[in-house]
C-alpha cells in the first residue's frame, strides 16, 4: 500500500483524539486560552454534560479578524515563536481550536479591546467559514456544540452526562484555585450555577471557596525554597483528611498538573500521620525557571518532567514535614463539630433521624431523650434520666475511694492544652483550658510521644545496636552480596553491621536494637530483593520507623490505666512540646477541643 499525505481535517481529528478526550478537556483548553488572554471574568455554560454545549465567555484582550482566521489553523499561536524552553503561558501548541473544530461545531466571536466591531468565524467538522463582522462585547466567546458529532465512535467512550458535568466542575475548580484574581461562573441546563468571586491576591480565601471554610481553619502555610525553586501553598493538618486524593491540588508555574511524582511526594510527606486509606488535603504551587521543567510531555499537559525530580520531591517532603513539625500538634477542628453534633437530639453517625415530636411535654423534657428511630439514642447511647441519678447519702466511703474521686489539684489553665481535671473511663483525660475544655485519648497521645522520641533518636544519632553472640551467616547469590556491600555504610548508620564472609555469603554482626528479636535471615534477604529497585537504606529506615511505631503502641500508656493528676498534666505538657502530637501513629486525633462558646450553645446560653 502506497504512503500518502493525510488531509488536514483527518490530521486535526487525530490530534483531537489526543488533546480532546472528553468535554472537560475542551473546557480546560478554552479556559486556558481565556486566562492567557488576560481575562478577569470567565463564564462557562454547558448542556448535556458538555456534549451538547460548552460556551466560554471572557473579557480578555480579544482577537482581530486576522488573528481569528489564524486561530483555527493548526500550530498557529501568539505564545511561542522559537523555543520551548521559556513557556510562560498555559497554552502554546496552537492545537486546541483546530482540533475541536474538526470534531464539533465551533463558533468564535471576538472583539479586541478598543475596537469598534467584532468578528465571528465558524468551523464545522473541519470546514472553516469566512470571517464575518459581528456585534460583540470586548473579549471572546467560544461556543462548542455537538462535540464529537464528526467522530461518533468517540461518544461511546464518554461517561454519563452527570459524570462529564462533574469533570468540568473539577476543571473549573482547579483553574479557580490557581488564579484567585479571576471571577468564574459555571452554569448550564444540567447544573446549578457555581459562582466563584474574585479574591484578588488572597489565595487562602479562594481555597476556602473551593475546599470549604474548614480547610482555612485546618491549613498550615507552606513557604520554602531550594536552588531557585520555591514552594508555597497550604497543607491540611494530618487529622483533616479525605477518602480520596481529589483534594490535592498542585500547580507548576501556575499550571494545574496531576503528576504522579508530585502526588507521591505529598503522600510521602504525610507518611505515618494519616490513616491507611485516607488522603491529606493540600494546595501547593511550585515556581521555577521554565527551562527546568518540560510541560510538553503529555497531550493534555497534565504531566510535567523536571530536570531534577529529586530536588522537587525533596523540597515538597521536607517543606510539608517541617510545617507539620511546627504546627503538627494541632488537631482538626472537625472533631469539635462532630462532638457538637453528637450532643444534638437524634444525632447518629449513620444518618438516622428522630421521629417527629409534638409540642413540649414531660415525656420529651430534658430529663428524657427524644425518641429516635432504631436503637440509636441521644448522643449515641441513652442518657440517664435525672430521676435515676443516685442521691447523696451519709454513708462513709473508704479513704482510698474518696481520694480517687477527687478532682486533680488546680493547675494554671493558660497552657494550650490546659490543666487536667478528671479522667473518664480510665482512658480519656478531661482538661480545662482558658476558653473551653480538651478531651485527650491518653493511649493515642502517649503512643505518639513514645514514637517521636524513638524516631528522633533514629534520625539524630546512630540507633543503638545489639551485637550478635554468634554472627549470622547468610548464603546469597554473588550479585546480591555485591549490592548489599555497596550499601554497607548506610546499613551501619542504621545499626545493621554486615561483612563479607567469603564468596556468596554475608555475615551479620549487629542488628538494630529497636528491632529486638528479628529474623536476620529474612531481613537481609528482603533487603537484597528490594535493593535492586529502591534505595535499600531508605527501605530499612522506613522499616525501623514502622517497627518504632509498633513498639510505641505496645509501650505506651494503655487504655484502662488510672492516671494520677500529675501524670495527666505531665502528658499534656509533653504533647504541647512534641511535634505531630495532634494525631497518633495511625493518623487518628489524640485530642478534641471544645470551646466554651460551643458548650454554652449546647445549653442555649448564647
Curated annotation (Swiss-Prot):
Cellular-component GO terms for this entry: mismatch repair complex
The keyword DNA damage is annotated on this UniProt entry: yes
Pfam families (alphabetical): DNA_mis_repair, HATPase_c_3, MutL_C
Source superkingdom: Bacteria
GO molecular function, one term: ATP binding
Keywords assigned by UniProt, alphabetized: DNA damage, DNA repair
Start and end residues of each stretch annotated as Disordered: 340-366
Gene Ontology biological-process annotations: mismatch repair
Keyword Iron-sulfur: no
UniProt biased composition (Low complexity): 353-366
Cross-referenced InterPro entries: DNA_mismatch_repair_CS (IPR014762), DNA_mismatch_repair_MutL (IPR020667), DNA_mismatch_S5_2-like (IPR013507), HATPase_C_sf (IPR036890), MutL/Mlh/PMS (IPR002099), MutL/Mlh/Pms-like (IPR038973), MutL_C (IPR014790), MutL_C_dimsub (IPR042120)
CDD domains linked to this entry: HATPase_MutL-MLH-PMS-like, MutL_Trans
HAMAP family associated with the record: DNA_mis_repair
Job description of the protein: This protein is involved in the repair of mismatches in DNA. It is required for dam-dependent methyl-directed DNA mismatch repair. May act as a 'molecular matchmaker', a protein that promotes the formation of a stable complex between two or more DNA-binding proteins in an ATP-dependent manner without itself being part of a final effector complex.
UniProt similarity note: Belongs to the DNA mismatch repair MutL/HexB family.
Identification of the protein by name: DNA mismatch repair protein MutL
Lineage per the UniProt record: Bacteria, Pseudomonadati, Pseudomonadota, Alphaproteobacteria, Hyphomicrobiales
Annotated gene: mutL
Amino acid at each position: 500500500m502506497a504512503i500518502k499525505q493525510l488531509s488536514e481535517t483527518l490530521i486535526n481529528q487525530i490530534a483531537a483524539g489526543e488533546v480532546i478526550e472528553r468535554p472537560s478537556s475542551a473546557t480546560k483548553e478554552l479556559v486556558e486560552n481565556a486566562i492567557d488572554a488576560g481575562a478577569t471574568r470567565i463564564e462557562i455554560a454547558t448542556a448535556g454534560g458538555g456534549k451538547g454545549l460548552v460556551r466560554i465567555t471572557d473579557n480578555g484582550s480579544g482577537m482581530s479578524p486576522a488573528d481569528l482566521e489564524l486561530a483555527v489553523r493548526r500550530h498557529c499561536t501568539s505564545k511561542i515563536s522559537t523555543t520551548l524552553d521559556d513557556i510562560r503561558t498555559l497554552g502554546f501548541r496552537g492545537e486546541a481550536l483546530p482540533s475541536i473544530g474538526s470534531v464539533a461545531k465551533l463558533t468564535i466571536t471576538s472583539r479586541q479591546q478598543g475596537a469598534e466591531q467584532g468578528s465571528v468565524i465558524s468551523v464545522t467538522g473541519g470546514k472553516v467559514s469566512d470571517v464575518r463582522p459581528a456585534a460583540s462585547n470586548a473579549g471572546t466567546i467560544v461556543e462548542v456544540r455537538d462535540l464529537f458529532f464528526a467522530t461518533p465512535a468517540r461518544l461511546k467512550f464518554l461517561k454519563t452526562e452527570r459524570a462529564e458535568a462533574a469533570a468540568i466542575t473539577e476543571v473549573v475548580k482547579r483553574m479557580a484555585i490557581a488564579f484567585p484574581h479571576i471571577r468564574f461562573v459555571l452554569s448550564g441546563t444540567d447544573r446549578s450555577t457555581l459562582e466563584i468571586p474574585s479574591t484578588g491576591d488572597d489565595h487562602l480565601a479562594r481555597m476556602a471557596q473551593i475546599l470549604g471554610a474548614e480547610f482555612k481553619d485546618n491549613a498550615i502555610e507552606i513557604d520554602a525554597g531550594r536552588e531557585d525553586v520555591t514552594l508555597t501553598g497550604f497543607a491540611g493538618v494530618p487529622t483533616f483528611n479525605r477518602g480520596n486524593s481529589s483534594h490535592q491540588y498542585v500547580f507548576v508555574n501556575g499550571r494545574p498538573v496531576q503528576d504522579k511524582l508530585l502526588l507521591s511526594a505529598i503522600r510521602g510527606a504525610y507518611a505515618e500521620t494519616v490513616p491507611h486509606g485516607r488522603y491529606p488535603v493540600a494546595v501547593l504551587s511550585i515556581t521555577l525557571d521554565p527551562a527546568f521543567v518540560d510541560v510538553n510531555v503529555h497531550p493534555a499537559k497534565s504531566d510535567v518532567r523536571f530536570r531534577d525530580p529529586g530536588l522537587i520531591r525533596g523540597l515538597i517532603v521536607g517543606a510539608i514535614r517541617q510545617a507539620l513539625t511546627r504546627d503538627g500538634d494541632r488537631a482538626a477542628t472537625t472533631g469539635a463539630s462532630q462532638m457538637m453534633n453528637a450532643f444534638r437530639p437524634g444525632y447518629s453517625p449513620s444518618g438516622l433521624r428522630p421521629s417527629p415530636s409534638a409540642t413540649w411535654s414531660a415525656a420529651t423534657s430534658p430529663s428524657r431523650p427524644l425518641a429516635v428511630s432504631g436503637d440509636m439514642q441521644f448522643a449515641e447511647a441513652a442518657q440517664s434520666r435525672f430521676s435515676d441519678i443516685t442521691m447523696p447519702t451519709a454513708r462513709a466511703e473508704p479513704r482510698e475511694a474518696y481520694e480517687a474521686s477527687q478532682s486533680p489539684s488546680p493547675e494554671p489553665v493558660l497552657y494550650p492544652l490546659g490543666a487536667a481535671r478528671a479522667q473518664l473511663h480510665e482512658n480519656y483525660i478531661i482538661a480545662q483550658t482558658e476558653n473551653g475544655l480538651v478531651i485527650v485519648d491518653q493511649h493515642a497521645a502517649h503512643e505518639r510521644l513514645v514514637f517521636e522520641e524513638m524516631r528522633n533518636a533514629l534520625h539524630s544519632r546512630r540507633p543503638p545496636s545489639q551485637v550478635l553472640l554468634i554472627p549470622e551467616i547468610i548464603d546469597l547469590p554473588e550479585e546480591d552480596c555485591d549490592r548489599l556491600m555497596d550499601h554497607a555504610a548506610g546499613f551501619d548508620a542504621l545499626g545493621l553491621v554486615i561483612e563479607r564472609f567469603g564468596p556468596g555469603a554475608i555475615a551479620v554482626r549487629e542488628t538494630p536494637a529497636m528491632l529486638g528479636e528479628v529474623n536476620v535471615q529474612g531481613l537481609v534477604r528482603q533487603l537484597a530483593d528490594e535493593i535492586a529497585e529502591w534505595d535499600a537504606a531508605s527501605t530499612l529506615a522506613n522499616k525501623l520507623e514502622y517497627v518504632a511505631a509498633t513498639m510505641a503502641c505496645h509501650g505506651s500508656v494503655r487504655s484502662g490505666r488510672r492516671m494520677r493528676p500529675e501524670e495527666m498534666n505531665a502528658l499534656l505538657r509533653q504533647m504541647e512540646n512534641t511535634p505531630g502530637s495532634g494525631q497518633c501513629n495511625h493518623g487518628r486525633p489524640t485530642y478534641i477541643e471544645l470551646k466554651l462558646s460551643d458548650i454554652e450553645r449546647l445549653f442555649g446560653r448564647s
